[in-house]
Design a protein with these regions (language model features):
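FAD-site-proximal beta/loop scaffold in flavoenzymes
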Residues: 132, 137-163, 235-240, 246-328, ...
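Beta1-alpha1 glycine-rich phosphate/pyrophosphate-binding loop at the start
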Residues: 2-82, 179-202
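Glycine-rich Rossmann-fold phosphate-binding loop(s) that bind the pyrophosphate
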Residues: 16-19, 44, 148-149, 169-174
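Mid-to-C-terminal Rossmann-like scaffold of FAD/NAD(P)H-dependent oxidoreductases
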Residues: 7-11, 296-426, 453-475, 520-522
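Local cysteine-cluster metal-coordination motifs and their immediate loop/turn environment
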Residues: 463-477, 493-510
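A Rossmann-like FAD-binding core segment of flavoenzymes
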Residues: 38, 77-100, 107, 184-280, ...
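FAD-binding core/adjacent interface of flavoenzyme oxidoreductases
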Residues: 1-10, 15, 70-165, 240-242, ...
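Immediate flanking context of iron-sulfur cluster ligation sites
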Residues: 453-464, 482-499
Length: 522
């Protein structure tokens, strides 16, 4: 570029304003300030980006709407970013590179990033009929809601305040976490699920141990196939099961899973499978000017030799991988558009690349007080499976609410299930992510949760990951506390630890307490 020529900023449009989009916007702020990017963010909800994972905590009163916010609209606008809330996109006009809104306005782009997330599944039940694929809570009968956004949280909070029995439909991790959160705060809760036990597909026999723990937490657990809902005076009154059984309640929370939002991509003829198909650079397949990140994206690298992708990866529904994608796209945009090979980013650190040979598979962790469950990798094999190099060790202690399963190939941990043993689960996660071999005596790992193990266990080292969502190590949190952070909120503001699922909050508090206990002792 001729130095005398005026700088023409690249027009970047981000469709969606959830946690993943907010992360990308942070990366692009320096480019906006430098005049190299004209950024427009189109959010469908009336609220700025917030941590959707913690919506259930808002519903039960554990935290506030303000506390889970991830972006300040006024601050972003003052930076020069065009943030539009309540903006609904009608379609994408690819030939003319513009996004058409339902109000008739057109927003032009040079680069388009789709961060449309996922929508809750509306089960096909009598009494819940509505437009196919609709996730509009306004189209649900009174007393019925999802638990996906702040509007849903307000609906559930009102039901709890009225001391109504909450019926949660869905035995997956979202339904279980919602049921536990409500029960822990004194709510009367019934969990209705399909199959023998909640989370049976993921946990196998460990699901039966989990079901016992849920009952001990005060939740009524009902197995059955739902056929419809019943209304009284126009308001939800119960769920009808096969066989005529009715589960009564004053409010129904639908937690039947989510599906990627792909309608905009389909409408402009982008390649779509479960999600919007993207290559390993997160560009929409066959496109030079469109990217997709987060729950709506499905990685399908066309390069068979690409070790980073290793085939197709469906949307994971986890906030950590979405943030990593936002980091990757943000870094690429900075390198392309900064004009000097890159603009130094200040503030939060991105989750570090684990490097070759280190596992990046998602680990699913149940986040609840006093009920622990974790699952990762391949878990279908049983102890009697005969296959070269494969070994499966399994323990069950239903009387004490404990279950563990370890799957190894040539001694290396490739899959795990752990229920009711938090220390064992944490150690297995560490071994799984490192691709480590297990000790010859697998049962030695179970001792971590014994009375003797609790007394002799040493704390994790500084290099251990404390916050899985943001990829923050224990050492980074320790450094922030030593520098003056005295609360989880302080640590989150400096390191981003704790801003994802919230499952590491107790670990952050422990680091803070240990720091000040040592200071007093000295």
């Amino acid at each position: 570029m001729n130095p005398s020529e005026p700088l023409v900023p690249s027009r970047v449009v981000v469709v969606g304003f959830g946690p993943v989009a907010a992360r990308l916007v942070e990366h692009l702020e320096p480019l906006v300030a430098a005049g190299r990017v004209a950024l427009t963010v189109l959010g469908q909800e009336p609220d700025a980006a917030y941590n959707r994972v913690l919506v259930a905590d808002v519903a039960v009163g554990r935290t506030s709407e303000a506390a889970i916010g991830l972006a300040d609209t006024d601050t972003l606008r003052a930076t020069g970013i065009d943030v539009r809330l309540g903006a609904r996109v009608d379609r994408i006009d690819r030939p003319f590179r513009r996004v058409l809104l339902t109000d008739g306005e057109a927003v032009d782009y040079d680069r388009l990033v789709l961060a449309t997330g996922s929508r809750p599944v509306r089960p096909r039940l009598t009494g819940l009929e509505g437009p196919a694929g609709s996730d509009d809570a306004h189209l649900l009968p009174p007393g019925v809601s999802f638990l996906r956004d702040l509007s849903d949280a307000r609906t559930v909070a009102a039901a709890l305040a009225a001391q109504q029995r909450i019926v949660v439909l869905g035995g997956g991790i979202l339904g279980i976490e919602a049921a536990l959160a409500a029960a822990e705060e004194g709510g009367r809760v019934t969990l209705v699920h399909h199959g023998r036990s909640p989370m049976e597909r993921l946990l196998g026999d460990g699901a039966r141990v989990l079901a016992t723990a849920l009952r001990q937490a005060g939740i009524t657990v009902v197995a059955g196939t739902s056929t419809g809902i019943e209304l009284e005076h126009g308001h939800f009154a119960g769920v009808r099961l096969e066989g005529g059984v009715r589960v009564d309640g004053g409010a129904l929370v639908l937690a039947c899973g989510v599906r990627p939002r792909t309608e905009l991509a389909e409408g402009c003829d982008l390649a779509v499978a479960d999600g919007i198909l993207v290559d390993h650079t997160l560009r929409a397949v066959g496109m030079e000017d469109i990217w997709a990140i987060g729950d709506c994206a499905e990685v399908c690298c066309l390069r068979s030799s690409c070790r980073a992708c290793a085939g197709a990866t469906a949307p994971q529904g986890l906030i950590g991988p979405g943030w990593q994608q936002a980091d990757d796209v943000g870094a690429a945009f900075v390198a392309d558009l900064s004009g000097d090979g890159g603009v130094p980013l200040t503030g939060f650190r991105s989750a570090p690349d684990p490097g070759p040979g280190v596992r990046r598979d998602p680990v699913v962790v149940l986040k609840a007080r006093g009920v622990d469950a974790v699952v990762a990798g391949e878990t279908d094999a049983d102890p009697w499976t005969v296959e070269p190099g494969l070994a499966v060790a399994e323990w069950a202690d239903p009387g004490h609410g404990r279950y563990a399963k370890m799957v190894t190939r040539d001694g290396v941990l490739t899959g795990l299930v752990c229920v009711g043993m938090p220390r064992t689960g944490a150690e297995l996660i560490l071994l799984f992510e490192r691709g480590s071999e297990l000790p010859a005596d697998r049962s030695s790992l179970l001792r971590l949760d014994s009375a003797e193990g609790l007394l002799t266990a040493s704390p994790p080292g500084p290099a251990a990951t404390l916050c899985r969502c943001a990829g923050v190590t224990r050492g980074t949190v320790q450094d922030s506390v030593a520098a003056g952070c005295t609360s989880v909120q302080d640590v989150s503001a400096v390191t981003r630890a704790g801003t994802g699922c919230g499952g590491c909050h107790d670990g952050i508090r422990a680091v803070i307490e240990q720091h000040f206990a040592a200071a007093v002792a000295s």
